[in-house]
């Protein structure tokens, strides 16, 4: 691995690239295979593939707005992504867990940013539901990576507090 003092934990960006590529390939696949809102049941009453476009943020927040939200969410994603790269670069050698968490969040943010900038919406295709009574909003691999990375960040904060260490950052 390159000199950690010079590059920080930037070599962990391979995870970011992997998340981005898997996210974009999966979105392209489901756009080619499914029509809008078509469902393919994978596990009855629990899990399906579907195709949905989200012009808003998480849970379709502001999706009904006139289009300005596309640029707002893109700007937020760019600022957050730049901040994550700086944070990643400043990590020390022993902060591997945190490096992986940041790389996951960054990969997901960039995957959804690409959709938003190029397509004008985010492509979602994973649908978790319970029978026909409850549906979680459709999501994608980028959203999953962001969620896993965020949980890892939260666990890192709790671990740091419990051991009496200063919070990473």
Swiss-Prot record:
GO terms for molecular function: aspartic-type endopeptidase activity; endopeptidase activity. It is a multi-pass membrane protein. Its EC number is 3.4.23.36. Residues 1-9, 90-96, 155-169 are cytoplasmic. Pathway: Protein modification; lipoprotein biosynthesis (signal peptide cleavage). Keywords: Aspartyl protease, Cell inner membrane, Cell membrane, Hydrolase, Membrane, Protease, Transmembrane, Transmembrane helix. Residues 31-67, 119-140 are periplasmic. The keyword Hydrolase applies. Inhibited by globomycin. GO terms for cellular component: plasma membrane. Changing residue 115 to A: Retains 20% of wild-type activity. The active site is at 124, 143. The chain crosses the membrane at residues 10-30, 68-89, 97-118, 141-154. It catalyses: Release of signal peptides from bacterial membrane prolipoproteins. Hydrolyzes -Xaa-Yaa-Zaa-|-(S,diacylglyceryl)Cys-, in which Xaa is hydrophobic (preferably Leu), and Yaa (Ala or Ser) and Zaa (Gly or Ala) have small, neutral side chains. InterPro entries: Peptidase_A8 (IPR001872). One of its GO terms (biological process) is signal peptide processing. It is found in: Cell inner membrane. It comes from the Bacteria. Changing residue 116 to A: Loss of activity. Belongs to the peptidase A8 family. This protein specifically catalyzes the removal of signal peptides from prolipoproteins. Monomer in the crystal. PANTHER family: LIPOPROTEIN SIGNAL PEPTIDASE. HAMAP family: LspA. This is Lipoprotein signal peptidase.
């Amino acid at each position: 691995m390159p000199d950690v003092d010079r590059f920080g934990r930037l070599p962990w960006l391979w995870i970011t690239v992997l998340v981005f590529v898997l996210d974009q390939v999966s979105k392209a696949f489901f756009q080619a295979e499914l029509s809008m809102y078509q469902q393919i049941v994978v596990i009855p009453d629990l899990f399906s593939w579907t195709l949905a476009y989200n012009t808003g943020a998480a849970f379709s927040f502001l999706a009904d707005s006139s289009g300005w939200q596309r640029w707002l969410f893109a700007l937020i994603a760019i600022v957050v992504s730049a901040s994550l790269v700086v944070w990643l670069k400043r990590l020390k050698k022993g902060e591997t867990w945190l490096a992986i968490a940041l790389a996951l969040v960054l990969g997901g943010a960039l995957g959804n940013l690409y959709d938003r900038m190029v397509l004008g919406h985010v492509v979602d295709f994973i649908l978790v539901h319970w029978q026909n009574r409850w549906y979680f909003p459709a999501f994608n691999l980028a959203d999953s990576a962001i969620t896993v990375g965020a949980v890892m960040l939260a666990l890192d904060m709790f671990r740091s507090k419990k051991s009496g260490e200063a919070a990473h950052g």
